[in-house]
Amino acid sequence: MFSISESVKYGWAMMKENMHLSVLSTLLMLAVGAVSGGGKGLFKSLFGILAAILLIVIRIGYSKIFLRITDNDKPKFSDIFRSYPLFWKYLGISILFPVIVFVGLLLLILPGILWAVRFSFAPLILVDTNMGIIASMKESWAITEGNFWSLLLFWIVVGVLNFLGFLALGIGLLVSVPVTTFSSIFVYRALSRGRAGITI
């Protein structure tokens, strides 16, 4: 079990304690994400593809940096580019996860919501443990067992916080994204520790 309020408090405290690295890495990720949509014309399309590839590398490194901070390590900003060996596995799970959720949404919506929540930690698990795609999804399913409603509420809170950050001229995302990332890792660690003996 975990506390949503405690996870948000933890996220806020960790963001403040590591503000420089948190904001700088978030700014990079958002900036690359903003230009990864491609555009009209061959050059813009190629640029968009390259930016999308770079974004995946950055997203992997971003998660790794925040995991290391949570584990009392001292990562550097340049470390955001050093987790590229996970690129193909992360790309695979980034495709498989939304496909599963989409199929679930087609099945009267409720299965999609269930699967979205139960598999929500799979990308983070992959980055944290270097497990395979299927193993990461199985692990996410296992650690979230018995916590569906609490996790659904948690992800709603995460969405609201980031939406409010977006409304603040987008600048608020430089705060809300690190806070919710640390909060997500807090919940992930709590669920991993409390996995044994839980039933849905």
Which residues does each predicted region cover?
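Interfacial aromatic "cap" segments that immediately flank transmembrane helices
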Residues: 2-32, 74-103, 115-166, 197-200
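Selective recognition of hydrophobic, aromatic-rich stretches within alpha-helical transmembrane segments
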Residues: 41-71, 98-138, 162-197
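Juxtamembrane "helix-exit" motif on the non-cytosolic side of transmembrane helices
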Residues: 35-40
